[in-house]
Amino acid sequence: MNNIIPIMSLLFKQLYSRQGKKDAIRIAAGLVILAVFEIGLIRQAGIDESVLRKTYIILALLLMNTYMVFLSVTSQWKESYMKLSCLLPISSRSFWLAQSVVLFVDTCLRRTLFFFILPLFLFGNGTLSGAQTLFWLGRFSFFTVYSIIFGVVLSNHFVKKKNLMFLLHAAIFACVCISAALMPAATIPLCAVHILWAVVIDFPVFLQAPPQQGKMHSFMRRSEFSFYKREWNRFISSKAMLLNYAVMAVFSGFFSFQMMNTGIFNQQVIYIVISALLLICSPIALLYSIEKNDRMLLITLPIKRKTMFWAKYRFYSGLLAGGFLLVVMIVGFISGRSISVLTFLQCIELLLAGAYIRLTADEKRPSFSWQTEQQLWSGFSKYRSYLFCLPLFLAILAGTAVSLAVIPIAGLVIVYYLQKQDGGFFDTSKRERLGS
């Protein structure tokens, strides 16, 4: 246990070795801006201390941290440094405890900052006493620690294909969530026992290389090579991409259905919101950035750029359109309200044009500054290509019928602008500027 600090230092260097102090300053500045923004939202919403006692607050904290840690750890196991870590004479328990701290700082803090700002804000305006503030900060901190450790346990069992243990820990977590809703007094003791189990029994055996890829991976390797199959192979084998896409599809459907039920948005706007939420899903849009390690090989092979681009576009647009159709069918079935033909065509145009723009933007300005996939998925740069899609949504203001003609024109103008930019995935002269 005495080597936790050196391991933690190495893990932080693995994430931030290229930028160093610049990354630290950028993260600190981002947290300050986020804190100011969230304080403004709390003030505008008039949130009081009664919100702290709501069950959904604890459940949101648990689920959010678990989801983010699960994505991070499953992506982490794909990195080469993890194979080296398995060979080094270091304590497995110390490694994963140190990794839990790194995950909190790098992945969870900015997503769950609200839970720590809220008690401090209420203390600042005199709503909470000092003792109450410490109580809520301690409570949220405890559940943060629990959810991170649980996420590490769940993701390791998933990666190592320990299905029985995966289901067992998932069942315990379900009991924790039920306890938080029905028996709050039993929640913390149950979490404490689960933490001890994870740290004492599971953590010491987690620093072992996972088994090789399964049958799907072998089938794809034996099949005739094509970039389209290659994208599907990557998507199926990448837990981060697969889970992020599934969660975003579920969230977009749930969020839109709630907005429709409360009457905040009308039916037409709801389906546009679904399109926007699906389009913001970034891991499946960074199909050139993810090729960083294979870039030089792809450049030297006799490959037509258009062949690669259209294969990636077919994959990406197919995922977006398929997800949209599924969400629309479920929302329409539950609400009993079907989507109009014009709105359906409008949303499909948004998705197809948005996919083309995001993919073109990623080809012309790929992000090669990452060292691990975890950095690519969690960095703010993943949303850069989404900004070019915003004019498409402005075109909606022209009305449904008119926007059907305006959206393709706006998309072509944006793509033309992007293609006129210097550099790109295949431009080796811009190698340093792209960060490769």
Curated annotation (Swiss-Prot):
<feature type="transmembrane region" description="Helical">
    <location>
        <begin position="27"/>
        <end position="47"/>
    </location>
</feature>
<feature type="transmembrane region" description="Helical">
    <location>
        <begin position="164"/>
        <end position="184"/>
    </location>
</feature>
<feature type="transmembrane region" description="Helical">
    <location>
        <begin position="113"/>
        <end position="133"/>
    </location>
</feature>
<keyword id="KW-0472">Membrane</keyword>
<keyword id="KW-1133">Transmembrane helix</keyword>
<keyword id="KW-0812">Transmembrane</keyword>
<comment type="function">
    <text>Involved in the production of the bacteriocin subtilosin. Required for immunity to subtilosin.</text>
</comment>
<keyword id="KW-1003">Cell membrane</keyword>
<feature type="transmembrane region" description="Helical">
    <location>
        <begin position="315"/>
        <end position="335"/>
    </location>
</feature>
<feature type="transmembrane region" description="Helical">
    <location>
        <begin position="395"/>
        <end position="415"/>
    </location>
</feature>
<dbReference type="GO" id="GO:0030152">
    <property type="term" value="P:bacteriocin biosynthetic process"/>
</dbReference>
<keyword id="KW-0079">Bacteriocin immunity</keyword>
<feature type="transmembrane region" description="Helical">
    <location>
        <begin position="55"/>
        <end position="75"/>
    </location>
</feature>
<keyword id="KW-0045">Antibiotic biosynthesis</keyword>
<dbReference type="GO" id="GO:0030153">
    <property type="term" value="P:bacteriocin immunity"/>
</dbReference>
<feature type="transmembrane region" description="Helical">
    <location>
        <begin position="134"/>
        <end position="154"/>
    </location>
</feature>
<feature type="transmembrane region" description="Helical">
    <location>
        <begin position="270"/>
        <end position="290"/>
    </location>
</feature>
<keyword id="KW-0871">Bacteriocin biosynthesis</keyword>
<dbReference type="GO" id="GO:0005886">
    <property type="term" value="C:plasma membrane"/>
</dbReference>
<protein>
    <recommendedName>
        <fullName>Antilisterial bacteriocin subtilosin biosynthesis protein AlbD</fullName>
    </recommendedName>
</protein>
<feature type="transmembrane region" description="Helical">
    <location>
        <begin position="240"/>
        <end position="260"/>
    </location>
</feature>
<feature type="transmembrane region" description="Helical">
    <location>
        <begin position="187"/>
        <end position="207"/>
    </location>
</feature>
